[in-house]
């Protein structure tokens, strides 16, 4: 297994996991869309998965945690659950990739290390795929509402920074997991496949003749 490839995959996966945590925490999934008469508004709305914030033109910001989960939009409810699962799977992947690292002493057997590291890579990929769902779903909802004439201009939103952070984090998770999986040694010859005892028996028989 290539140590450099494994370290690169673990590093990218860890950065992706941190990106998932950041995007899940910051209240920047949806921001006020400045269109029409809204361009002179004195405040900006930020909406996240756990809270919403109002930023005044003076720079003062007030945030409030959502009182009821059922009052949230469907995409935000699902994004909460999916990103939490993605973060948990990513954490498991990090532990597995560290334990299976060639530069660590958690496992003595190299074959076991390779298997554990590859398992971590698969977990990183799963976490990345899960991480792609919430920003894509939210982005689709924002675009649909933005071009919906029945939605008031004051209620229309644009993409927040958290959506782009989550997309980037998910890509890093998938790439990191792919590197860990590709670093698994292929075509190894097991010592059990050697026929040394048979050749020794053949030499012994020739001596008796």
UniProtKB/Swiss-Prot annotation:
Gene expressing this chain: cldng
Entry keywords, A to Z: Cell junction, Cell membrane, Membrane, Tight junction, Transmembrane, Transmembrane helix
Topology versus the membrane: Multi-pass membrane protein
Chain spans, region Disordered: 187-209
General function of this protein: Component of tight junction (TJ) strands.
InterPro entries: Claudin (IPR006187), Claudin_CS (IPR017974), PMP22/EMP/MP20/Claudin (IPR004031)
Identification of the protein by name: Claudin-like protein ZF-A9
A Pfam family matched in the record: PMP22_Claudin
Annotated transmembrane regions: 8-28, 81-101, 114-134, 159-179
GO molecular function: identical protein binding; structural molecule activity
GO biological process: bicellular tight junction assembly; calcium-independent cell-cell adhesion via plasma membrane cell-adhesion molecules; cell adhesion
Protein's UniProt keywords contain Coiled coil: no
Cell location: Cell membrane; Cell junction, Tight junction
Biased composition (Polar residues): 188-201
Family in the record: Belongs to the claudin family.
The keyword Membrane is assigned to this record: yes
GO terms under cellular component: bicellular tight junction; plasma membrane
């Amino acid at each position: 297994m290539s140590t450099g490839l494994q370290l690169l995959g673990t590093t990218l996966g860890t950065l992706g996991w941190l990106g998932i945590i950041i995007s899940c925490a910051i209240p920047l999934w949806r921001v006020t869309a400045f269109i029409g008469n809204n361009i002179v508004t004195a405040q900006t709305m930020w909406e996240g998965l756990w809270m919403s914030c109002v930023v005044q033109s003076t720079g003062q910001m007030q945030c409030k945690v959502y009182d009821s989960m059922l009052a949230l939009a469907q995409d935000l409810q699902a994004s909460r659950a999916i990103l939490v699962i993605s973060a948990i799977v990513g954490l498991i992947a990090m532990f597995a990739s560290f334990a299976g690292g060639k530069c660590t002493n958690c496992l003595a057997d190299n074959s076991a290390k390779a298997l554990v590291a590859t398992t971590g890579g698969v977990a990183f990929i799963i976490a990345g795929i899960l991480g792609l769902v919430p920003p894509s779903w939210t982005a689709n909802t924002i675009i649909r509402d933005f071009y919906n004439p029945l939605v008031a201009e004051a209620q229309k939103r644009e993409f927040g920074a958290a959506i782009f952070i989550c997309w980037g984090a998910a890509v890093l998770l998938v790439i990191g997991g792919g590197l860990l999986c590709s670093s698994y040694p292929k075509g190894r010859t097991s010592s059990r496949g050697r026929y040394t005892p048979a050749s020794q028996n053949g030499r012994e028989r020739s001596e008796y003749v």
